[in-house]
């Protein structure tokens, strides 16, 4: 027994070292992309935030030499002058409200349409459902610039829709250069990804569960809300978060289809940076958008955590 004890101890040590070596090997394999992200994304973000706090020296000196209306600090931590200026600006508050409203409304419409298409495909499976799914995915292959311009030309005051109404002697609606036009274009551009995510989640629900619910007397509505949607909850949350993050920071769609004022913060950031030569205020807006997107991303992180927990269980 005493002779075998050292060998058992050595074996146990080897078993402990193997997971450690594997984790270290995995960390080394993942380090190159992490370093690239830190160098080309994380470091510029740190510089931009420092500039927004009034640190205009170092690598921010070139931008500070040509920028206007800057808030410069002598304190080590910076100054909140730029944040105070932007957050108290009535125009920024109005555009922030428009951005949040467009994001919430567009994301809600996208989710409703995506779930309708996904459920129709799952519960019927006919050629009409497959055709509807294919048509819903078509905008995925159309560039956002072309899609935005097409929506504008369709709903513009001199666009296709009003021309058709004019042929019948009617006054057609005008959605071009309006917030409603921005919502329509956002839904058009965001729907394909949401359809793919929701359809994959709904299709993954086992037929046995649906049949069991029907055998128990559950109707279509009860089966949908009690079985299908809870089982596909994680893909639905992922679709909602990606859609919301994509809309809240968008530039092309509101730039082409929206009004000059009020507009979304993506357009405001570009205007302040290029047209007004006020990059410090533009970065403050970017920080606000980043904070809002981070709040949306919390739902995505929670959904992934829940999915991993359920898979581990």
Task: Please identify what each model-predicted range represents.
Residues 153, 251-279, 313:
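Glycine-rich helix-loop "coupling/hinge" segments at transmembrane-helix boundaries
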Residues 25-67, 90-171, 182-203, 231, ...:
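Membrane-water interface segments at the C-terminal ends of transmembrane alpha-helices
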Residues 1-22, 28, 56-88:
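Membrane-topology segments of multi-pass transport proteins
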Residues 2-5, 10, 199-210, 214, ...:
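C-terminal transmembrane helix and the adjacent membrane-cytosol boundary/short C-terminal tail
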Residues 1-31, 124-130, 299-313:
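Transmembrane alpha-helical segments of polytopic membrane transport and secretion proteins
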Residues 128-131, 177-180, 195, 209, ...:
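Residue-level recognition of membrane-helix boundary sites in multi-pass small-molecule transporters
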Residues 23, 179-181, 205-238:
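Amphipathic cytosolic juxtamembrane alpha-helices at the membrane-cytosol interface
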Residues 68-85, 179, 260-274:
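Short hydrophobic, aromatic-rich alpha-helical segments embedded in or entering the lipid bilayer
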């Amino acid at each position: 027994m005493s002779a075998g004890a050292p060998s058992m101890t050595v074996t146990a040590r080897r078993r402990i070292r193997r997971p450690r070596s594997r984790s270290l090997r995995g960390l080394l394999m993942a380090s190159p992309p992490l370093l690239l992200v830190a160098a080309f994304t994380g470091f510029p973000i740190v510089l931009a935030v420092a500039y927004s706090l009034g640190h205009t020296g170092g690598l921010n000196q070139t931008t500070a030499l040509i920028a206007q209306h800057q808030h410069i600090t002598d304190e080590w931590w910076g100054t909140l002058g730029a944040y105070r200026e932007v957050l108290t600006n009535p125009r920024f508050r109005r555009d922030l409200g428009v951005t949040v409203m467009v994001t919430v409304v567009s994301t809600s419409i996208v989710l409703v349409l995506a779930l309708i298409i996904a459920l129709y495909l799952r519960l019927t499976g006919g050629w009409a459902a497959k055709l509807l799914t294919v048509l819903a995915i078509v905008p995925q292959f159309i560039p956002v610039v072309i899609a935005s311009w097409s929506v504008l030309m369709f709903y513009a005051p001199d666009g296709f829709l009003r021309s058709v109404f004019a042929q019948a002697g009617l006054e057609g609606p005008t959605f071009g250069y309006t917030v409603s036009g921005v919502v329509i274009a956002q839904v058009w551009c965001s729907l394909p990804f949401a359809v793919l995510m929701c359809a994959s989640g709904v299709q993954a629900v086992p037929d046995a569960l649906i049949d069991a619910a029907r055998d128990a007397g559950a109707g279509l509505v009860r089966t949908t809300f009690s079985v299908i949607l809870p089982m596909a909850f994680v893909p639905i949350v992922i679709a909602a978060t990606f859609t919301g993050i994509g809309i809240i920071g968008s530039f092309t769609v509101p730039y082409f289809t929206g009004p000059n004022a009020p507009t979304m913060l993506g357009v405001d950031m570009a205007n302040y940076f290029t047209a007004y030569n006020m990059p410090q205020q533009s970065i403050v807006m970017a920080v606000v958008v980043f904070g809002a997107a981070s709040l949306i991303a919390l739902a995505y992180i929670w959904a992934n955590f829940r999915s991993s927990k359920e898979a581990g269980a």
